[in-house]
Amino acid sequence: MSKSTAEIRQAFLDFFHSKGHQVVASSSLVPHNDPTLLFTNAGMNQFKDVFLGLDKRNYSRATTSQRCVRAGGKHNDLENVGYTARHHTFFEMLGNFSFGDYFKHDAIQFAWELLTSEKWFALPKERLWVTVYESDDEAYEIWEKEVGIPRERIIRIGDNKGAPYASDNFWQMGDTGPCGPCTEIFYDHGDHIWGGPPGSPEEDGDRYIEIWNIVFMQFNRQADGTMEPLPKPSVDTGMGLERIAAVLQHVNSNYDIDLFRTLIQAVAKVTGATDLSNKSLRVIADHIRSCAFLIADGVMPSNENRGYVLRRIIRRAVRHGNMLGAKETFFYKLVGPLIDVMGSAGEDLKRQQAQVEQVLKTEEEQFARTLERGLALLDEELAKLSGDTLDGETAFRLYDTYGFPVDLTADVCRERNIKVDEAGFEAAMEEQRRRAREASGFGADYNAMIRVDSASEFKGYDHLELNGKVTALFVDGKAVDAINAGQEAVVVLDQTPFYAESGGQVGDKGELKGANFSFAVEDTQKYGQAIGHIGKLAAGSLKVGDAVQADVDEARRARIRLNHSATHLMHAALRQVLGTHVSQKGSLVNDKVLRFDFSHNEAMKPEEIRAVEDLVNTQIRRNLPIETNIMDLEAAKAKGAMALFGEKYDERVRVLSMGDFSTELCGGTHASRTGDIGLFRIISESGTAAGVRRIEAVTGEGAIATVHADSDRLSEVAHLLKGDSNNLADKVRSVLERTRQLEKELQQLKEQAAAQESANLSSKAIDVNGVKLLVSELSGVEPKMLRTMVDDLKNQLGSTIIVLATVVEGKVSLIAGVSKDVTDRVKAGELIGMVAQQVGGKGGGRPDMAQAGGTDAAALPAALASVKGWVSAKLQ
């Protein structure tokens, strides 16, 4: 009996756990602290700093089932999804990793045992082929002599990409950094399927499918291209769960595995489709996975960066649902079936199900309003098309007006064998594309980063000053032995009370000092396991090995502690007032303010803001104890501790509790009791992206200062209105009513003046072929009065063409009016466009009335003078 996808995932993890590997949970799809990467796209992403020597773990062997997304940037599979057997936007990468522990021998033996042992995957040995890098004799011999694979099934792959080490079988993290040869394992589906072994001209066929890639990181590539052997070689492997499931379930397409069969049936049910072979079902089944998990990991649909990629995927799915005949919103209904089919890998998603469904539903409803009109416009353009390519300008117009991503337009065109001029589209939309598509590789030169082998012990929970020793100094990213007065540097100590920026809390400031020197610390940051004090040596000199006294700015730290504790109280209060869908999406805690981003689909009502504020202040008055406990991560989650979005946690974590009101994982610094906070006030609530709100708040002395400021403003307003704070609202209402009355009277006077001006103007009209033409520049007339004047003049003049202009603060306002009986010969929109072009502007409107603006007031007289000749030509 074949294993289910969930069973295969668990078997992989169980196998490597039995081989001494730590089972590590999948990291977020949003890479932590890695601006070089759009989405997590491989199992090794969360271990990148470990491989680079910037981070240390308490284990040297790990195994994961990592959620990955490839859509956008270098790894863009979107346009192929649904049309091929193995392309996905979302997939799970099974992997095992060695950080300086085992190397080639064990890595290969582990892979062979898992794949072929009757206890595990039990694949026929004769169906497995392998490739190795051309010069990797060690791997070749292990496969041949120890594993026993015949030579004809071991293929050496050289530099097949046009440069040294540019090979399918040589992996590198970037232009510099860790790299090394890899060996890949292929499964032969049999001669009933077309295709040849890897390295052959027919390798693109579907007969031989790569199922596992094992990378041997044994070199550090320098900027000049030289390869230095790594002191502790490592192993990074990746096997696509969906691919190995297809092999083990004896199907040739990933979309035929149990997971996708179930999802496809769910898609058919919510869309009303009956043909289960329809490619649109595959597209939607794939896309619900990437969309749901991206939203669960904090990405919201938007027009920038990750949010734009998410929006593209959602809209592509909705369009395919439209093709299947879906009559109402359907996409969000697939979140439940997805959770069911993902098993243990869907637990994070289940906790946020309501929020994910709401975001998908809202986005689909917004897009549905324009989808029909956009498709109609595209159909119209395709009907007019004489060749086989849609121009880029039309593709851009569809994006700009209807929100059609270009790949959605390309999808529609592809079904009709029509290409899209993507170069033309890119030219029209270069800036948007630059923002939306970030580089997706490991492009940063990590050799230039500060790398510290030593670790710093943080003692700032209990101390604000202590003595330490300088273990490293860096100037401009380079290690030095000493610094002198006036130099900016990063100072690393063996132990420190300074808190390094983490979890939204800013780094400490303060001073490092000794008998003959003073170093002003302006920021504190982490460098792997070391803590770096960033600042400037104010006096004296400092060298590695010197003893220092480290003093944190105590008053600043105290204000930060209050703000951080208030952030936890507010998070819990938001979940009580708004609902448990609220989860933290980001935060900033400094000594002046706390800023908190959270998931919520609409602006908070004033009464909700007040309720949160009151609830937090109630907890402050309760003077709850703030306690910390160190425990296992799983135990903390079982206790209900909330985790911070985007943070990485060790297996042992710090749990912060405030009585019975709040429990969160947190490594920051906090007050001793909630009463220390004193007072909490929300000063703003706003939106930052679709489905994400932001609150800014102040505490303690800062909150009291805002109370005083509000009181002072009220007193000032009361004084200006000659009242007091008790009757202030009545006074304001009275002033507003008087203002409205005066504005009404002023408007009446303006209309009377305009009517009089119109009467005076009518006598200036001239006759052009039986039509009255009036062209005039007016001074002292508001632009919005021009329309009223044109209406009056049309009533007075009968068959007429009118052009009026006025200049206010250097800006030209134009209006053209044409009586109905003349619009067959002269259209107001064309006339105003001709005039506006001459004054550096543009405009438009109906055939009988059109408006425009311009910036070149000096050109106005000549532009108005050109009207008579233009009109005369039209009326001939």
UniProtKB/Swiss-Prot annotation:
Subcellular location: Cytoplasm
GO biological process: alanyl-tRNA aminoacylation; negative regulation of DNA-templated transcription
Sites bearing N6-acetyllysine, chain numbering: K74
Name the record gives this protein: Alanine--tRNA ligase
Record annotation: effect of changing H568A: No effect on tRNA editing
GO molecular function: alanine-tRNA ligase activity; aminoacyl-tRNA deacylase activity; ATP binding; DNA-binding transcription repressor activity; identical protein binding; peptide lactyltransferase (ATP-dependent) activity; protein homodimerization activity; Ser-tRNA(Ala) deacylase activity
Entry's cofactor comment: Binds 1 zinc ion per subunit; it is not clear where this binding occurs.
Regulation affecting activity: Acetylation at Lys-74 decreases the alanylation activity for tRNA(Ala); a protein that is fully acetylated is inactive in vitro.
Effect noted on mutating D188N: No inactivation
Annotated GO CC locations: cytosol; membrane
Annotated PANTHER family: ALANINE--TRNA LIGASE, CYTOPLASMIC, ALANYL-TRNA SYNTHETASE
Annotated residues for binding of Zn(2+): H564, H568, C666, H670
Alphabetized Pfam families for the sequence: DHHA1, tRNA-synt_2c, tRNA_SAD
EC number: 6.1.1.7, 6.-.-.-
CDD domains in the cross-refs: AlaRS_core
Cofactor: Zn(2+)
Consequence of substituting W171A: In mutant 6A; abolished binding to lactate and protein lactylation. In ATP-binding mutant; abolished ability to mediate protein lactylation
Domain free text: Consists of three domains; the N-terminal catalytic domain, the editing domain and the C-terminal C-Ala domain. The editing domain removes incorrectly charged amino acids, while the C-Ala domain, along with tRNA(Ala), serves as a bridge to cooperatively bring together the editing and aminoacylation centers thus stimulating deacylation of misacylated tRNAs. The editing domain removes incorrectly charged amino acids, i.e. Ser-tRNA(Ala) or Gly-tRNA(Ala) become uncharged tRNA(Ala) and the amino acid. It is specific for the acceptor stem of tRNA(Ala).
